[in-house]
Swiss-Prot record:
Gene that produces this protein: YIPF5
Subunit structure, as described in the record: Interacts with the COPII coat components Sec23 (SEC23A and/or SEC23B) and Sec24 (SEC24A and/or SEC24B). Interacts with YIF1A. May interact with RAB1A. Interacts with YIPF3 and YIPF4.
Name this protein carries in UniProt: Protein YIPF5
GO biological process, any: vesicle fusion with Golgi apparatus
Species assigned in the record: Macaca fascicularis (Crab-eating macaque)
UniProt keyword Magnesium, yes or no: no
């Protein structure tokens, strides 16, 4: 033990004191600490000047009852973003341009060739009805064993483009491509009847030829009547009916053969 005490005494320096080390390590708040010069002059009470003035206002006490809130706490009704409520917005079908009343009137105009066509309604660009009639025409051809959807759409596009160019040359007001496609599509309705007859019996006999000629005349007369009333082309119905008859004659050939 005497040797161990001598060893510990020799290990520490003569000027080193454990009491001085503990005082130097833990006395951070005193004036003699190593950090006293850096942090002693900082005033923590200065943080209050950065608080916004609105946050320092005292809150008003709630004077109402729990089950009967005052008017100040009544939530306001949300304001609409677009200025109008949802009840005032038009229906989705009207925004898409689908009007069942106009579709029905155009269909009746085609089914009654002698009926006077309304030019204001017929001048609209409505492609909902023509698309339905084109699909119905292709479906009836499919029932007859003729997969001709590509021919139907291709001939329809070429025919609409040709009639669009022709009517713009003949009329003074001009016409849009959508209006031409709409009228020609609606007048395809009698051709659906012809393709439906082809499902039941053959149209390659004399009866079929007469029926086919009547359907072609029906379609071309209805289309020319609508174009004349919509574009104010009085006295030119035969000139418009001839190219329409050529177009619907191609559809009739697809139905017969």
């Amino acid at each position: 033990m005497s040797g161990f005490e001598n060893l510990n005494t020799d290990f520490y320096q003569t000027s080193y004191s454990i009491d001085d080390q503990s005082q130097q390590s833990y006395d951070y708040g005193g004036s003699g600490g190593p950090y006293s010069k850096q942090y002693a002059g900082y005033d923590y009470s200065q943080q209050g000047r950065f608080v916004p003035p609105d946050m320092m206002q005292p809150q008003q006490p709630y004077t109402g009852q729990i089950y009967q809130p005052t008017q100040a706490y009544t939530p306001a009704s949300p304001q609409p973003f677009y200025g109008n409520s949802f009840e005032d917005e038009p229906p989705l079908l009207e925004e898409l341009g689908i009007n069942f009343d106009h579709i029905w009137q155009k269909t009746l105009t085609v089914l009654h060739p002698l009926k006077v066509a309304d030019g204001s309604i017929m001048n609209e660009t409505d492609l909902a009805g023509p698309m339905v009639f084109c699909l119905a025409f292709g479906a009836t051809l499919l029932l007859a064993g003729k997969i001709q959807f590509g021919y139907v759409y291709g001939i329809s596009a070429i025919g609409c483009l040709g009639m669009f160019c022709l009517l713009n040359l003949m009329s003074m007001t001009g016409v849009s491509f959508g209006c031409v496609a709409s009228v020609l599509g609606y007048c395809l309705l009698p051709m659906i009847l012809l393709s439906s007859f082809a499902v039941i019996f053959s149209l390659q006999g004399m009866v079929g030829i007469i029926l086919t000629a009547g359907i072609i005349g029906w379609c071309s007369f209805s289309a020319s009547k609508i174009f004349i009333s919509a574009l104010a082309m009085e006295g030119q119905q035969l000139l418009v009916a001839y190219p329409c008859a050529l177009l619907y004659g191609v559809f009739a050939l697809i139905s017969v053969f």
